Amino acid sequence: MQEIAADLGRYSVDAFEFLHEGLDYTVRKIHGPPNPVADNILKWLRENGIDPDNLDALLEGAELPPTVAGAIEQMGGFAAIRDRMNRHVAGDELCWGLRDLALEKWGVMAPAVLASWGIRSTKDFGRLVFALVDNELLQKQPEDRIEDFENVYQFDKAFTGAYKISLTAAE
């Protein structure tokens, strides 16, 4: 991450670490907790250089090891496993998830913390994501574009209007 941050020159390593944490937060928020069986199947596919889109054909042709085929059947078949393996989030979804996480962590100080790392707009989130994609640390879908991160929200409004401070009477 340090090399990528140095190459870009505008973001702190902390920005990349927050992005990683925020991606996990957003994926869990949208798709629920990870499924160990689906994760193991994905790991096997990656290790064997197999495109997940080819999984159905391999399953139908009985070309999968029995343990992998059994795991797919255990999950409810190809359609069910495909849905569980899809942990993709769109650019705008990630931006909102990053905002929510920042508010949980830092409250009204969230914009200042992010700015100290070089993040001042949702486009900055996109630049971070695509730097990781370019360095093969993240994967993207064919339809994913950096423009998906442009003007998702305005920082000055998204962070200040969303955080509520509650006051309770002292006893």
How does the language model describe each region?
Residues 1-54:
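N-terminal, charge-rich interaction modules
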Residues 140-171:
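Long, compositionally biased
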